[in-house]
Amino acid sequence: MNTLSLGALYIESWHHSLGGAEDTLLGPATGFLIGFPGDYWLVTAWHVFSGRRSDNGKIMSKKGLCPDYVRVRFAGTADGGFQPIIQRYDLYDGEFQYNRRWRSPDDRRIDIAALHIGALPEGVVEASMPNTWPTLRDLFPPERHAEQASEVDVALPLRVTDKLFVLGFPFGDAGTWPFAVWTVAPVASEPLAGWNDLPGFLLDSRTREGQSGAPVLMHIRPGEPVVVGGDVIMHDESVTALVGVYSGRIHKESDLGKVWTVDALFEIVPEAAPPGWKPTSPRD
């Protein structure tokens, strides 16, 4: 079992109804945690928290409703297995969505958002995503790290056609819960070129509704060849890195989907960034 399968969280967005009426489920999504024990952030897509399209800002619900809170299904340990621990997180202070509790980029087209949740509920399995990018040194067993020269401290490249994975719950189907579905997603556009002048790129993957907000991972298994600088490197260690946040397909008839880079995520949550990280976009 890969422990990262527990790292993608099943989310439901809800509208709070006034006057004693039942609350309305707006839809399923996926999220994940970044941060440190006792100080976590819940990450998903902007449109999951806002209930609006990221391209034009229009409300997505046919009833004209937007989320007031989300329910997150965490995995708790019980009798050698897992039990669901459902936690509600309000998205706003008060009843009328005035003061939002979550962060997002100034440009809503960068479809990511993060909500500070702090410590997890008691008994929950803590499975957060890594916040560092691997280097060649990480391909060697830990006992051999020190003997490697400084040349191996170069970051592993991310290139078009490289294989990535989107971890989530397609169509909101939690039949595999608490383990997420790993959807293979080759890189379909040049990662460094951006997407519409924004910090993202395209994946070629049959992702579906319910996977919005999912973590996108690079996962290299032991023995898989890694090409760096024209050299083919065979290795004994598995390497995993958080590449970004998946936010959905560019069109309902297309299998091309958008992923926003981890740097764009750290721009809104610098508290969870690795030591020495610096923003890539100018700040005032």
Stretches found by the model and what they are:
Residues M1-L4, V48, M218-D284:
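C-terminal subregion of chymotrypsin/trypsin-like serine protease catalytic domains
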Residues N2-G19, Y69-R71:
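A short, Trp-centered hydrophobic/proline-enriched beta-strand micro-motif
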Residues T44:
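Cytochrome P450 catalytic-core helices
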Residues L6-A8, G27-P28, G35, K58, ...:
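Serine endopeptidase catalytic core focused on the charge-relay Asp
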Residues A21-W41, L256:
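A conserved glycine-rich beta-strand in the N-terminal activation segment of trypsin-fold
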Residues L18-T24, P37-G38, G80, W195-D197, ...:
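Short, solvent-exposed loop/turn segments that connect beta-strands within catalytic domains
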